C-alpha cells in the first residue's frame, strides 16, 4: 500500500507553491495618501445626496490638472476613466467636471452603447492600458456587477472583486467604486453598505462622505476613512459644495 501511495504521488501534478523568501517587497504608491492607493480598489460610500459623486469628480479633476489634493503633494497630470450609470454624461457629468476644473481631454469613458460594462469585462483592463489610465471611477457599484449577480451573496461577489483587484494590481491603476448605504437605522455604516459585507472586506480603503447638518449657511461635507488596510488612518477632511464646485 505504501509503494502504491508513493507511485500515485509521483504521478500527481505538483501544486504551485512559492517561498516567501522569493517574494520581492514593494512599497505602496498613493494617489491620495492614505485615502486612495494606486493598484488597489477603494470604496467611497455615503447616503444619497451627501457628496460622494462630487468628491469623486473633484479627485478625477485633480488627477487631470495636476493640482494638489487636500493634505497631499501635487501630482503629474494623468488620464482618468469615469464610468457612470446614474447621471447623464452631457448634461450632468461633464458640467460638474468642468466646475471642478478637470482637463476634459484627460477624462475618458468606455462607450457602453452596444454592450453594458461589468466588473468582469475585459474592456476595463484594455482601456486602462491603451489610454495610460491611472484612476478609474465606477459609479455606482451595483450598475457594474453584471446580469443575474446577487450582491447579497458572498459567493457571487467575491470573484468579481478578486478580478477587479487583480486588474488594479496588474496595471497599477487606482480603482474607485461609489456605493450607497442602505436604509437601516442605528447600525454601523460599515454594515449598511448595499449588498454583502464581502464588498467592504474586499476593498483596501473605505471613505465615508457625510454632510455637516449644523452648518446651515455653508454646504460643508466631511470625508473620513472607515477602513485602511495599508496605512494609518488620516484625520477627516472637510470640503464645501457651491457654484464653483468643490472647495
Regions found by a protein language model. Name each.
Residues 55, 59:
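Hydrophobic positions on the alpha1 helix immediately C-terminal to the Walker A/P-loop
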Residues 7-10, 20, 26-27, 31-33, ...:
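Conserved inter-motif catalytic segment of the P-loop NTP-binding fold
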Residues 72-73, 198:
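Short glycine-biased active-site loop of nucleotidyltransferases that positions the nucleotide triphosphate
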Residues 64:
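Gly/Ala-rich phosphate-binding loop of Rossmann-like dinucleotide-binding domains
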Residues 38-42, 78:
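Pre-Walker A (Motif I) flank of P-loop NTPase domains
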Residues 2-15:
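Charged, amphipathic alpha-helical linker segments immediately N-terminal to NTP-binding catalytic cores
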Residues 43-44, 49, 53-54, 83, ...:
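Phosphate-binding/switch region of NTP-binding enzymes
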